Amino acid sequence: MSQSFEGELKTLLRSGKVILGTRKTLKLLKTGKVKGVVVSSTLRQDLKDDIMTFSKFSDIPIYLYKGSGYELGTLCGKPFMVSVIGIVDEGESKILEFIKEVKQ
């Protein structure tokens, strides 16, 4: 994969559709409307466990971002913390391929 996660995330935010936030992402994850999930390293463990459990049932890839929620928020161009990003439509990005490649 030639581009970094940050580059793919910026392409995703520009051309795709995402949901920011744990509650909204969990809700869509339970209904199978999310294609992938990005989780920051600072997300509470109980919430991270919930996301991992639901994603395994639906075979939805998860990327564990090594930075904090504040760093992920900054990457998203937000002035606040973003702990979870739900990918609804990847647009022109290849972020789902990137996530699957990293998992292998």
From Swiss-Prot:
Keywords attached to this Swiss-Prot or TrEMBL record, sorted alphabetically, are: Ribonucleoprotein, Ribosomal protein
Q: Name one Pfam family in it.
A: Ribosomal_L7Ae
Instruction: Give an example GO molecular function.
Output: RNA binding
Give a yes or no for keyword Ribonucleoprotein in this entry.
yes
One BP annotation, GO:
translation
Q: Which GO terms describe its cellular component?
A: cytosolic large ribosomal subunit
* Record flagged with keyword Phosphoprotein: no
- The family this protein is said to belong to: Belongs to the eukaryotic ribosomal protein eL30 family.
List the NCBIfam families. PRK01018.1
- This chain's protein is named Large ribosomal subunit protein eL30
Q: Which organism is it from?
A: Sulfolobus acidocaldarius (strain ATCC 33909 / DSM 639 / JCM 8929 / NBRC 15157 / NCIMB 11770)
Q: Which gene encodes it?
A: rpl30e
